[in-house]
Amino acid sequence: MSLVSNSLALIERGANEILKFDELERRLRSGRPLRIKAGFDPTAPDLHLGHTVLLNKMRQFQELGHQVIFLIGDFTGMIGDPTGKNVTRKPLSHEDVLANARTYEDQVFKVLDRTLTEVRFNSEWFGKMSAVDMIKLAAQHTVARMLERDDFAKRFVSQQPIVIHEFLYPLIQGYDSIALRADVELGGTDQKFNLLMGRALQEHHGQPPQVVLTMPLLEGLDGVAKMSKSLGNYIGIKEPPIDIVTKTMKIGDDLMWRWIELLSFKISAAEVVALREAVAKSELNPREVKLRLAHELVSRFYDNAAAEKAIAGWQAVVTGQGNNNLLPLQKINVPADGVRLVALLTKSGLAPSNSEAMRKLKERAVRVDGIVVDDAHLHFVPGFEGLIQIGKRNFAKVRLVTSSESHDFPESNGIDKS
C-alpha cells in the first residue's frame, strides 16, 4: 500500500463524510504539508471528550506531517452558533469568551503537537473588518439558501424568531477559511452547512475550495445524547484520573466500541475486529476492553503512571478493598421534595430504565452505602450523599441537590423512610 493510501486509510477512520475525497487525495499526492483547520467557539470553559474527537483527527494529520490550525472563535463565540438550536442563543461578553478561551489554550496540547499547531483567534481579522466589509460579506449569500438549513427551516415554519445576526454566523465561519487559506476543515456532522459555506466563499474569492471532513458527534455517558456539559453526560479532559477511569468504566458495552473508534489511537481497526469477536464469544470480558480505553485516555491527558494509579484505585474500590472517597461525586438535581429510589437509580445512570431498576431491586442487587435494599418506595431528599450500587461493579457516589441550591447542606442522612 502506498504512502498516500496509508494516509487516506488513517484519515478515513471514524470519519462520517469527506467532501471531496478525490480533492483530498490529489492534495496529499502533491507532497506539501496541508493546512488543516478546526474552529472551537469558547462558549463554556474546559474541553471534554466530545471536543477531542476533532482534536484526535487533527493529531492524526499532524502525525502525517501536516500543519493544523486550532482556531478559537472569540469573535463568533460572542454571536453564538445557531446550529441545532430552536431558539436564539444568548450572546456572551468578550470577557467571558476570553476567559473560556484561556482554558482551551491550556488544555489543547494534551492532544495536539505544539510544534505543528497554530493557535489563532478569528478576532484577528474580524476585529479589523469595517461595517462595509461585513455588508459585502453578507451580500455573498441569499436568505433562501440560508433557509435550506434544517434548524433555520424548522424555526421559520414554526414561526420561531430567527435573528439576522444568526444568518451571519455561517458566513463568518466560512470567511475564517479564507483568512487562514485552509486546505481541509474539520467539524461535527452538525456543522456540514457551515463547512460547505467555507468552500463556497473560498471559491468566490479565488482560492482552491477546502476539503470538508465531518466527524460523528460523540454520545455522552448516557449513550443517547451528544456529550454536553449542560446535560452532565461528559468527561472533562482535566478531570482527576480516577474520575476519568470511573466514568469510562460505567459506559454501556455498545457505547464502548463507538468510543474506541472515535477516541483511541492505540487500538487499531483490525484489533477492534478481534476484540469484538472475543467479547461476542465470551472469551473476553468487556470490562477489560474498557480498562484499556480508560488507561489510554488517562495516559494521554496525564501520563502512564497516573493511569496505572487510577486503575489500581478503581479496582481496589470495586473489590471492596479501597477507599470510596476516591470515587468522583456525582451531583444529581432532584425536586425539592426529593426522589424515590427507582428514579435515583435511573438518574444516576446505574439503570437504563425504571423497569430495569425495579427488576434489580426485586433481585436484591441494589445497595445503598453497602446495605442491600429492595424497597422501591425508599425516598431520598436533597442533601443525601452516599454510595449506591447495582451488582459488584456498577456504582455511583451521589449527592442530591436542587437546581436552586449551591450551598452546603445541613447535616442529614437524606433518607426519608416515611
From Swiss-Prot:
Residue ranges annotated as motif 'KMSKS' region:
226-230
**InterPro entries named in the record:** aa-tRNA-synth_I_CS, aa-tRNA-synth_Ic, Rossmann-like_a/b/a_fold, S4_RNA-bd_sf, Tyr-tRNA-ligase, Tyr-tRNA-ligase_bac-type, Tyr-tRNA-ligase_bac_2
Q: Motif 'HIGH' region in this chain: where? A: 42-51
Where, if anywhere, are coiled coils annotated?
A: none
What top-tier enzyme class does this entry carry? ligase
For this record, an example GO cellular component is: cytosol
Looking at the keywords, is Transmembrane present?
A: no
Reaction catalyzed: tRNA(Tyr) + L-tyrosine + ATP = L-tyrosyl-tRNA(Tyr) + AMP + diphosphate + H(+)
Subcellular locations according to the entry = Cytoplasm
Q: What is its EC number?
A: 6.1.1.1
Q: Which GO BP terms, alphabetically?
A: tyrosyl-tRNA aminoacylation
Q: Which UniProt keywords apply?
A: Aminoacyl-tRNA synthetase, ATP-binding, Cytoplasm, Ligase, Nucleotide-binding, Protein biosynthesis, RNA-binding
Q: Which domain of life is it from?
A: Bacteria
Q: Where does ATP bind?
A: K229
User: What are the residue boundaries of the S4 RNA-binding domain, all occurrences included?
Assistant: 339-400
Q: Which molecular function GO terms apply here?
A: ATP binding; RNA binding; tyrosine-tRNA ligase activity
Q: Name one Pfam family in it.
A: tRNA-synt_1b
What is the predominant subcellular site recorded for this chain? cytoplasm
| UniProt record similarity statement | Belongs to the class-I aminoacyl-tRNA synthetase family. TyrS type 2 subfamily.
Q: What does this protein do?
A: Catalyzes the attachment of tyrosine to tRNA(Tyr) in a two-step reaction: tyrosine is first activated by ATP to form Tyr-AMP and then transferred to the acceptor end of tRNA(Tyr).
| Quaternary organization | Homodimer.
What protein name is recorded for this chain? Tyrosine--tRNA ligase
Q: Which organism is it from?
A: Xylella fastidiosa (strain 9a5c)
